[in-house]
Amino acid sequence: MSGSTTGCGGPCGACKFLRRKCVADCVFAPYFDSVEGTSHFTAVHKVFGASNASKLLMMIPASRRLDAVVTLTYEALARLRDPVYGCVGHIFALQHQVMNLQAELAYVQTQLSTLQGLPPPNSQNNSRTEAASSSNVPLISSVDSKDNMSSSSSHIPCMSQQQEQEQPKEAIEVPTESVDLSTFFGLENPVDEDGDLNALAREFFTKYLTGGKYRPSSLI
């Protein structure tokens, strides 16, 4: 959308589309050139009509006609792409995009405020290590106490065993010589008439009391 006529004196884009001679005071010549102006004016003509667009531009001051031509062209192209909504569909799409961006921005701001409220990672690590060390102290003391108790309890039986070993055992003396069997069995009056009882007592003493070491003397 540039000056009225081309340098060669050809018609503007609007007059080229309308197949008419472009006059000096053509209202479309300053805004529709002969290259791209033809396609733009085609859209304006299909949507608004050439006569209606000409009347509208004549009613607007010359300082604001460029904005009006840009608006008419944008609306005409949008109506050709979307005959129902036109440029309103573009407005709805942009509003929806703005709402999505605002929601995303609010989410990011919430996450940022949450992260700013948290302490730095170094302080968190220090607090965790301090808590772990403080929790390990009673465990170590309890383990030490258990070890001391177990060691003391293990020393007690050892000491008792040592004491038992140190105590002298009383030797059990077993007579190996000949014993007066009448006195051993509590007989006040030994049997002299029959020597069988005395021999039986010697045999019993030899087997069960002296472990077979006792040798009975020969009978008289």
Curated annotation (Swiss-Prot):
PROSITE patterns: LOB. Residues 123-139 have a biased composition (Polar residues). Belongs to the LOB domain-containing protein family. Pfam families: LOB. The lineage of its organism: Eukaryota, Viridiplantae, Streptophyta, Embryophyta, Tracheophyta. Residues 10-112 form the LOB domain. This is LOB domain-containing protein 31. Expressed in roots, stems and flowers. Residues 117-172 are annotated as: Disordered.
